[in-house]
Design a protein with these regions (language model features):
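Active-site capping/gating regions of soluble enzymes
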Residues: 52-54, 111, 126
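All-alpha amphipathic helical-bundle segments outside canonical DNA-binding/catalytic cores
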Residues: 127-139
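Short linear sequence signals and composition-biased patches located at protein termini or domain-edge surfaces
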Residues: 129, 149-153, 159-189
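Hydrophobic side chains within alpha-helical segments
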Residues: 53-56, 86, 149, 179
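ATP-dependent phospho-/nucleotidyl transfer catalytic cores
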Residues: 1-49, 54-68, 141, 159-165, ...
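Activation of the activation-loop gatekeeper triad in protein kinase-fold domains
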Residues: 70-75
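Active-site activation/catalytic loop segments of kinase-like enzymes and analogous catalytic loops
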Residues: 77, 81-124, 141-160
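A structural signal for short hydrophobic/aromatic patches embedded in well-ordered alpha helices
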Residues: 24, 115, 134-135
Length: 198
């Protein structure tokens, strides 16, 4: 869809987003690791929620502990990296998904570490070393994918996501891309943190 949107440029917005398109294209090959490893038999599909953003979790009002996961209509076979990645994208972001002030948008490493530590307490027994090693990549992948989705919709004239202003999808794109850059900048620290379970 992204390449079709760029090719057709139906809303005439291509010129203002060429720099973002270049950044997406530059990362495209690196974002195919999950599928490549699956084809090579090094990564398997599991039962996944497939929409593990923070607002699909119910929290206890007094303790802030997670009570349960909701929105179960999305459960299907998928990759652990995607489920982890969407939580990192939404839960460890210091800004809003559509934050206009990009200075607000970064990865909160304390949240990343706390979430990962809690997840690994339960998941270490069944995850493969490849999955464990690639959990931080899942955050980058899902943030990249959401950047592409918002940008594609902006190029197409805002036909998929509900918008609240004419530039809303562009604002979302830039905020997600800033988060991606922050995740990339912290990749070494995240990878080192994961070595505790390898």
């Amino acid at each position: 869809q992204f390449h079709d949107a760029v090719k057709s440029n139906v809303a005439g917005r291509l010129d203002e987003v060429k720099d973002l398109i270049e950044e997406i294209e530059k990362r495209a090959e690196a974002m195919c690791i999950q599928e490549r490893l699956y084809r090579e038999g090094k990564l398997k599909k599991r039962t996944n929620h497939c929409d593990t953003k923070v607002n699909n979790m119910m929290f206890d009002a007094e303790t802030d502990k997670v009570l349960c996961v909701i929105d179960l209509d999305t459960v299907m076979p998928g990759f652990v990296l995607s489920d982890i990645g969407d939580f990192i994208r939404t839960g460890a972001n210091t800004g809003a998904e559509d934050d206009e002030n990009l200075d607000n948008v970064n990865v909160n490493m304390d949240i990343f570490k706390a979430y990962t530590r809690g997840y690994m307490e339960k998941a270490k027994s069944f995850l493969t070393p490849t999955e464990i090693k690639l959990l931080p990549y899942g955050g980058r992948l899902l943030t990249y994918m959401q950047t592409v989705r918002f940008l594609t919709d902006y190029i197409n004239g805002d036909t998929y996501y509900k918008i609240h202003s004419p530039k809303h999808n562009l604002i979302r794109t830039k905020a997600q891309f800033k988060l991606l850059q922050s995740l990339e900048a912290h990749a070494g620290e995240m990878d080192a943190f994961m070595s505790e379970w390898l």
